[in-house]
Amino acid sequence: MPVDFTPEQWASYHQEWGDFQREMRLARSGNDTARGRAALMRFRQKAGMLRAAQTAGLVAAHVGRGYQVLVAVELVTTAADPVAEHLERLEIPVARIYGGGADLEAERLRFQRGDAHVVVFNTASAINLQANELMADGSRATSAQRIGIFHQPRYSGIQARQTIGRAHRDYQVCPWSLLYAAGTVEETAAKIMVDRLVVTSNSVDGDTGALHKIAALFGADWLPDSTLEP
């Protein structure tokens, strides 16, 4: 799902993209893997932060229509925190399942019991967020329809599939959207991710092929595949 940048956001994006390309060229010419990794991470951090307000606005609209919303992120300080803070400024309760400072199970239960209408999380496995979950105490999670949003593309198709499965289980259906800034390199990366989800079924070989394509898109095809994974 494309979102549109404001003129100010476009100015920031073009500056960051130019800085990234220059840094990646220098890293590649010196075969400096650490420098290349750092450049790619900085760009992904800044691209995610630029869109935090648009993601929060879309989430707020879904909450207004009665949904409970899952927001999947990869990075904390430049994605999870900004999105959660935007929502809390809109007086929308948010459960935070990321980082090490909170009781993550207590946060999960806040969302499942409806005390928080939104959960922002960065784990791809081992948590249940589906409607009507049967709890350990015999109670059930709320029946409110879940809807999911990828704030950032998961470059690993396998991890993306696992993330989708957090609420798309036990006969519960949770539709997902992938947000990206229209007209940017993120748009192409997002399309590669979606294509990989469509044509593979947890295929390790297929997932590696997608990582190669995305690496080439960023001029990072000389770096190890793990560079694109969180």
Where are these regions (language model features)?
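Short, catalytically relevant binding-site loops at active-site mouths
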Residues: 77-79, 102-103
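Alpha-helix capping/helix-boundary segments
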Residues: 75-78, 124-126
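Non-catalytic, charged low-complexity extensions flanking SF2 helicase motor domains
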Residues: 175-230
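Interdomain linker/hinge connecting the two RecA-like lobes of the SF2 helicase core
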Residues: 1-69, 73-76, 82-88, 200-211
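Alpha-helix boundary/capping residues
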Residues: 16-20, 62, 167, 196-197, ...
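Conserved RecA-like P-loop NTPase helicase motor core
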Residues: 93-190, 196
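Alpha-helical elements of Rossmann-like donor-binding domains used by nucleotide-donor carbohydrate transfer enzymes
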Residues: 54-58, 82, 110, 162, ...
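Alpha-helical elements of the RecA-like P-loop NTPase motor core of helicases
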Residues: 11, 53, 81, 85, ...
